[in-house]
Amino acid sequence: MNAVSMATPVFMILMAFGNLFGIGGCAFISRSLGAREYERVKKISSFSFWGAVFVGLLATLALTLGVSWILPLVGADASANIANISKDISGDAYDKLVQNYQNLEQYTRDYLFYIGVGAIPTVLSSAMSNLVKGEGAAKVSMFGMMIGAVTNIILDPIFIFGLDMGVTGAAAATVVGQLASLGMAMLFHYRWDKEIRRDWKHIRPQWGLIRGIYAIGIPAAIMQGLLSVMVLFVNLVFGTQGDMAEPLQAAYGIYYKIQPVSYTHLRL
């Protein structure tokens, strides 16, 4: 549970990068369609698509090859956590805490690795679900997210308990859920979409186009990214609390997951 809490903010940061291209591209596509600038729509969608792929590729490299540098940032570095154990704790209690922190580091490492392997579909799913909204296909976006969520819910117990994969099963289920969501968006793109493109010939950098996407995409990404950074910071602070660190981090992880439900109605 704690490993998932440690790694979830990283996953949300990936989603924020998807929003950078998705929400920015969505708004720009809507304006361009209204102005009947169809050639610009092709350029916007191509840039957003391949931009998301590129960022996802960088995230894959960072999370699979550089995970050892990321662990301290998310509060899962065993040596740092062990150093914060109170000197009043000794014997079996100390050994148990050391083992718990070592397990936490390994589980978080495994979870982040799987998230890294699935970084491209994660970022691209977030981007594409927003891009199709730009064409007015909000239902397609909604169904895609629902399919991804349901797939994740179904596969979690199968991977975690049925296949005895543990925390890596939770990560694998999350990645497969993102693939399912992306699959819905791509199905719409291939079968019914007439405007969104992903052709290389349309991704030549143009400052006006990039500025139009980032003008809306960057604020959207920052809003979600700052929330994840806040959670990372809180986990680091809790990590200094010695033997109380794990229960504090676990409790905050649960709160972080259910907290968005409390204001969902405000988005309606």
Role assignments for model-derived ranges:
Residues M1, L71-A78, D92-Q99, I158-D164, ...:
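Helix-terminus/linker motif at the lipid-water interface of multi-pass membrane proteins
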Residues M1-M12, N103-Y107, V167-T168, L209-I216, ...:
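Interfacial/gating helices of multi-pass transporter permease domains
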Residues A3-T60, T122-S141, A251-R267:
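Small-residue-rich hydrophobic transmembrane alpha-helices
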Residues M12, I115, S141, G212, ...:
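Residue-level signature of transmembrane alpha-helical cores of multipass secondary-active transporters
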Residues F17, V53-L65, I120, L124, ...:
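Generic alpha-helical transmembrane segments of integral inner-membrane proteins
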Residues I29-G118, G162-I218:
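Short alpha-helical transmembrane segments in multi-pass integral membrane proteins
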Residues A52, L131-I154, T168, A172-V175:
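Alpha-helical transmembrane segments of multi-pass membrane transporters/permeases
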